[in-house]
């Protein structure tokens, strides 16, 4: 019994160590991702990120339980409006989900650039009248917004809530490795 508990803790309760590899999203954006992440196919992107704008980059893992994406938002902000933009994006987070438990909300400097950071757990309630979506969907999310040259670049990680502890440390490494050239 002890061995089963120990193995369960090892596989489900402790953060995993990932080999990080440099990833070039485009000519202006590089970051480190765990090596098991691979670019999503156009079909995966269309299914998981339905939008008029395709992401600059979208990556997933073989189990499809964790995703990382880089997008340019339609909202345009000046870097000097970072506090107002933070409140705007915060409201958007709370409107997007049925329940949000904010873990971290701040402006953080990463490689000389100021990012708006939201780390949170989310829940979308299930529909009791639906045969497909009865159970709530719980996810761990880490989102960073960069206001640069009149653009808003969004770096977003999410995974199933039950594997949150496995990914939190790696996500922090991903987000602090982001490098964006000024010419974007």
What are these regions (language model features)?
Residues 77, 122-125, 159-163:
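Solvent-exposed loop/turn segments at secondary-structure junctions
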Residues 24-25, 45-51, 107-114:
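Short, ordered beta-strand-loop transition motifs
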Residues 17-34:
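Short N-terminal segments immediately surrounding and downstream of signal-peptide cleavage
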Residues 35-39, 150-184:
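Surface-exposed amphipathic alpha-helical segments
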Residues 86-144:
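Signature of long, low-cysteine stretches enriched in small and polar/charged residues
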Residues 30-87, 91-95:
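Secretory pathway targeting signatures of secreted, lumenal, and periplasmic proteins
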Residues 1-7:
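Sec-dependent signal peptide recognition
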Residues 144-150:
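A short, solvent-exposed beta-edge/loop patch
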């Amino acid at each position: 019994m002890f061995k089963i508990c120990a193995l369960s803790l090892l596989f489900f309760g402790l953060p995993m160590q990932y080999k990080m590899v440099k990833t070039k999203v485009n000519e202006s954006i590089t970051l480190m991702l765990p090596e098991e992440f691979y670019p999503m196919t156009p079909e995966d992107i269309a299914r998981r990120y339905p939008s008029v704008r395709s992401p600059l980059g979208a990556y997933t893992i073989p189990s499809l339980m964790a995703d990382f994406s880089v997008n340019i938002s339609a909202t345009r902000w000046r870097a000097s409006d970072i506090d107002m933009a933070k409140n705007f994006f915060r409201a958007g987070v709370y409107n997007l989900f049925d329940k949000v438990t904010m873990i971290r909300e701040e402006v953080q400097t990463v490689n000389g650039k100021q990012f708006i950071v939201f780390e949170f757990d989310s829940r979308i309630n299930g529909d009791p009248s639906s045969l497909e979506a009865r159970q709530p969907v719980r996810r761990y999310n880490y989102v960073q917004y960069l206001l640069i040259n009149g653009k808003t670049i969004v770096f977003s990680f999410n995974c199933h809530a039950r594997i949150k502890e496995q990914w939190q440390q790696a996500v922090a490494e991903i987000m602090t490795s982001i490098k964006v050239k000024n010419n974007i």
